[in-house]
Curated annotation (Swiss-Prot):
One of its GO terms (molecular function) is toxin activity. Expressed by the venom gland. The lineage of its organism: Eukaryota, Metazoa, Ecdysozoa, Arthropoda, Myriapoda. Keywords: Disulfide bond, Secreted, Signal, Toxin. Contains 4 disulfide bonds. Its main location: secreted. It comes from Ethmostigmus rubripes (Giant centipede). It is found in: Secreted. One of its GO terms (cellular component) is extracellular region. It comes from the Eukaryota. It holds the Pfam family SVWC. This is U-scoloptoxin(16)-Er2a.
Amino acid sequence: MNTVSVVQFLAVGCAVFVLYGRGVFAAEGVKKAGQHKDAELCLGSDGLGHRLDEFWYNDDMCQRFLCFKDDEGIMYEQIANCPIAIAEGDCTLKPGTKGHYPDCCPAVECPPEDQKEEEI
C-alpha cells in the first residue's frame, strides 16, 4: 500500500475532516463529556466512567474514544471514526481486520506507481 500524506484540513463544527491522497477521508469529533458521579472520571457516550487520557473502544462500530480536560478544566470526549474510503481507478477497497480502531477500518489499496508505468 502506498504511503499517503495529509494534503488538506477542513474543519466543520466540532468535526475535523482530513483529506488524504487516493480517496481516504478521516473524521474525528469532539463533544463535551457528561459529568460522572466520580469527579475524576469522564462520563463517556457509552454511559460508563473513564479515566482521563486513557483510550477505550467500541469494536462493533470501529471507534476509539478519549476523554481529556481543556485549560479551563472542562472534560471533553474525543471520538475517532474510520475514514471514508473510496476506491477509484485501479485501486481496491480492502476490508479492515477485526479488533480495535484503526485496524478494523477499511483501506484503499492501489498498485505501485512503477507497476502502472510498466502496463502502459
